[in-house]
Amino acid sequence: ASASYLRARLLRKDYDGVKSFIPESVLTILLEEIQTGRAPCSLTALERPILAALRNLSPEELAKLPDVSEGLEYRIASAVRKTTSLDQLFAEIKTKRYTHARIRRIIVSAFLQMACDYNSPTPPYLRVLGWNDKGTEILRPARRTASLPIVMRGGDLKKLAEGALTIAQLGSRAEDLYSLSSPEIQPCGLDFTSSAARQRS
């Protein structure tokens, strides 16, 4: 099943409909997140803030977003003035050249105030989200020899060099805004305080 299919099921609270598609260990965590109000998250929950952010941007500012070229900024600016929902906005902007997924990425970039300056072919650091005993064997030597910093705890982000720290702060801001889309709004700064999840055998 696709991620879109699973998200749609979760938003409809059809939890039985996703059980057969995800591992039991993941399902346990997912149900805990749902119970605490941290899931499921939905872009629709951010509809008004996103539309507000877009209405404050000029075509010149839109042109600085990643993936915007060939005058697309004017098409976006025009669509923003005419539409009253994200679905309408995406439909108004979409063309054969600019797919729905690409348009959605651009709109989210605008909401996050993410300019082309942040576009880099290589990441400034590696973020470990979770690991098990086998992962420990790999990570221990890798942290000494890797060409990029390996981040396992939120506190590690504060030790990054200036350029990498800028990207980490952008990621943290995205996390803060993303948390507004959960059923229960979460506090800011979780990206700098959370740690990778460890699965013990």
Segments from the language model and where they lie:
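Active-site cores that bind ATP or allylic diphosphates and position pyrophosphate for catalysis
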Residues: 1-201
